[in-house]
């Protein structure tokens, strides 16, 4: 009871103990919660009957008796919450979690190859694609390890298949060298990293946001990348779809950073209108190519024509060594310098397409919460709660954390009297990134790193 949040109440205490014993604990909890939420007892009993339909009749009867008694006990406590509204007629929604939406976004983008080695909390992305593999003509390969998985994806992409991998921080640690390979060969690949508390095995079934700096700098050498961090289940779909298009356009690795909380959080979402999401077309197809064809030709944008081996008369050559425009290796110092600059030119293009952060709340806030990834909802709710108390509050959320465009948000930060970074890590990694890229120092932080998700109450407690 001491841990109740503002407006919270106790729905069960010791007087319920005789009912909520042993194997009937969950059934009693359902009975109590059903009454509090105003659910019809007959409907709940019907659902329970379906759940226990395959068990012994006596077991089903015992559970139904406990359910009814717990429901009646709850009624005697005279505790209730705002009644749920009736759903809109003829309104169909999808019950999906973050990983479901990433998989669906990848499907909409036309993913054709996914390699993975199972690792919580990202595994269900690949398992979803396995379910759709036959109908969508996707190859999903469970590799022997993460090194093989990402190299398979890079190879498949070079051969013309829109490709991805899904892993967690520990698994991605094994992929870092191959990320450099994608950078050097300018090969598109989407890499989903589901964060969980580390170091090492850490807390494998809990949540954290401690891999931002790792992802920003993973892979030896300098080459461009984009990093997304969706803030909601719906954004998981949008970001996944966008990631594949950017990977193909700018020919390199694009990351999607999630975490256990977002990956496993279910939400009712409106159906996505897939006709609005044309799939990625890998490589330059049906386009006139200047001869002789050079895979790594110098261009003003840094983006070279990418042909798919075997789909034209041209020979497609690349290498992990530094190379000439035609893909053959070289140690020519001038070529080396020009190639580094060519690859980094693509970062300027990525900046022009960077997603603007989402702003929520008062336009001239006294308190501004800055967040990225899964803390979006908690920050917006915390801002709304402060606003109800008469305080000007707002939230600024980043669904793309690299590259950053300071001109998109510095004015907003400057207007706020107090800026607070909210992150599920111990060191304020995103706040440090903002300072490094823009010079703006966020002096106030709310950090959580015990493995539990950040809540509005946790934020407000940190503010006070």
Predicted regions and their residues:
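Short coil/turn connectors at secondary-structure junctions
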Residues: 5-9, 79, 90, 109-114, ...
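A short, gly/pro- and small-residue-rich
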Residues: 1-15, 182, 186, 430-447
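Short gly/pro/ser/thr-enriched loop/turn and capping motifs at secondary-structure boundaries
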Residues: 3-5, 17-18, 123, 147-150, ...
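Flexible, low-complexity linker and terminal segments
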Residues: 95-103, 107-109, 239, 244-464
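Active-site cofactor/cluster-binding pocket
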Residues: 1-109, 113-115
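Thiamine diphosphate
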Residues: 113, 120-217, 226-247
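Gly-rich Lys/Arg/Thr-decorated short loops/hinges at beta-loop-alpha junctions or inter-strand turns
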Residues: 52, 76-91, 106-111, 130-136, ...
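Flexible, glycine/charged-enriched surface loops at secondary-structure junctions
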Residues: 43-44, 56-65, 77-86, 116-117, ...
């Amino acid at each position: 009871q001491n841990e109740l949040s503002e407006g919270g109440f106790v729905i069960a205490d010791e007087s319920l103990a005789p009912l909520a014993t042993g194997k009937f604990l969950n059934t009693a909890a359902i009975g109590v919660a059903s009454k509090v939420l105003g659910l019809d007892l007959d409907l709940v009993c019907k659902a329970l009957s379906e759940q226990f339909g395959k068990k012994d009749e006596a077991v089903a009867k015992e559970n139904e008796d406990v359910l009814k008694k717990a429901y009646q006990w709850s009624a005697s406590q005279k505790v209730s919450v705002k009644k749920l509204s009736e759903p809109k007629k003829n309104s169909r929604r999808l019950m999906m979690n973050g990983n479901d939406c990433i998989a669906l976004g990848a499907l909409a983008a036309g993913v054709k190859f996914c390699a993975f080695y199972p690792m919580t909390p990202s595994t269900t992305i690949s398992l979803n694609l396995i379910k759709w593999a036959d109908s969508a003509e996707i190859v999903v390969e469970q590799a022997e390890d993460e090194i093989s998985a990402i190299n398979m994806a890079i190879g498949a992409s070079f051969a013309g298949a829109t490709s991805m991998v899904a892993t967690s921080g520990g698994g991605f640690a094994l992929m870092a060298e191959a990320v450099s390979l994608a950078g050097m060969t300018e090969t598109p690949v989407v890499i989903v990293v589901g964060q969980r508390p580390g170091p090492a095995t850490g807390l494998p079934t809990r949540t954290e946001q401690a891999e931002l700096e790792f992802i920003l700098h993973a892979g030896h050498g300098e080459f461009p990348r984009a990093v997304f961090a969706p803030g909601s289940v719906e954004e998981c779909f949008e970001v996944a779809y966008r990631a594949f298009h950017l990977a193909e356009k700018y020919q390199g690795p694009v990351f999607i950073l999630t975490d256990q909380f977002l990956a496993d959080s279910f939400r009712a979402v409106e159906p996505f209108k897939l006709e609005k999401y044309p799939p990625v077309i890998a490589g330059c197809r049906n386009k006139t190519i200047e001869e002789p064809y050079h895979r790594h030709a110098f261009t003003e944008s840094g983006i070279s024509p990418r042909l798919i081996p075997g789909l034209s008369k041209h020979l497609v050559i690349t290498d992990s060594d530094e190379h000439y425009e035609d893909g053959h290796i070289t140690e020519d110092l001038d070529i080396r310098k020009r190639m580094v600059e060519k690859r980094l030119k693509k970062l300027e293009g990525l900046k022009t397409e960077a997603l603007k952060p989402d702003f929520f709340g008062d336009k001239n806030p006294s308190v501004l919460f800055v967040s990225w990834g899964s803390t979006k909802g908690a920050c917006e709710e915390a801002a709304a709660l402060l606003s109800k108390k008469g305080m000007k509050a707002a939230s600024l959320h980043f669904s793309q954390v690299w590259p950053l465009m300071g001109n998109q948000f510095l004015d907003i930060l400057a207007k706020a009297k107090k800026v607070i970074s909210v992150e599920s890590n111990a060191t304020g990694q995103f706040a440090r990134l903002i300072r490094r890229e823009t010079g703006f120092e966020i002096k106030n932080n709310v950090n959580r790193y015990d493995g539990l998700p950040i809540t509005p109450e946790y934020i407000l407690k940190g503010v006070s």
